[in-house]
Amino acid sequence: MSQQELPLFATSHQAQRGAVEIEPGAIWIPSWLGDREQIELVAACREWAKPPAGMRRPHMVDGSPFSTMSVCLGWHWYPYKYSRTCDDHDGAPVKAFPPILTDLGARACADTGFEATPFDAAIINYYAPGAKLGLHRDGSEGDDVIGRGSPVVTISLGDTCTFRLGNNRTRNRPHHDVQLASGDLLVFGGPARGAYHGVPRTDPGTGPAYLTLDGRLSVTLRESGQVEP
C-alpha cells in the first residue's frame, strides 16, 4: 500500500476551524494553547530541564555544537539514534514520557485531522536569543514510521520564530516560511513527513511577558519506532 493510500492524514476540512494547511500533510493552528496552558507547559519544561538527564547542548557527529539546547523525554535522541540513557551527556536514564504530552499529542492529532499516534519520544529545544536550527529531516525513527507518514507535533512557546518547511527532495527551494508565535501548533506528517525543515531565526523579545521566558521553547513529539531490546 502506498503512502498516499494510507488513511493516516485526513482531508483539511476535518481539521479544527482556524487550521491552515501549509502544504499537503502540514497543518498550522495559531493560538492553539491558551495562556494558562502555556504557563503550565513552560513550568513543566523547566522541571524536565533539571538534572539528571537534563538539558544539554547536543553535538553533531563531527563534534560541532548545536546553537540550541535540548532535553529528551521517553527516548533520548542524539545524532542520529535513540537510547534509553543520555549517552552523549551524563549517562542517566532518560525521563519518562509524561501524561501531559500524551494528552497534548492526542489533541493535536484530533485537531489537525491525523489519526491517533502512539507518541513516545519528546525533544524540548531551547532557543536562546540568536539561536537557530538548520534545515534537516527527521529520519532516526526508521523506515516503517517514516513510510507511514507518522506525524511530528511541534508546540511553540515564547519568542516568535520563522519556521521553514521545505520539500522532500532537497534543502533548496521550494519552501514555506511560517511565523510561529507562542501557543501555536504545527503538525506535519503523511506526504510532508520527510520534508526538510528548520528555524532560520527567532525574534527576541516577542514572547508573552507572563511566561518569563527569555527565548523560545519548542516541544516536539514523535513516534520513535524503537523496540525495547
What are the residue ranges of the model-derived segments?
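Non-heme Fe(II) oxygenase metal-center motifs and adjacent flexible, charged/small-residue loops
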Residues: 1-229
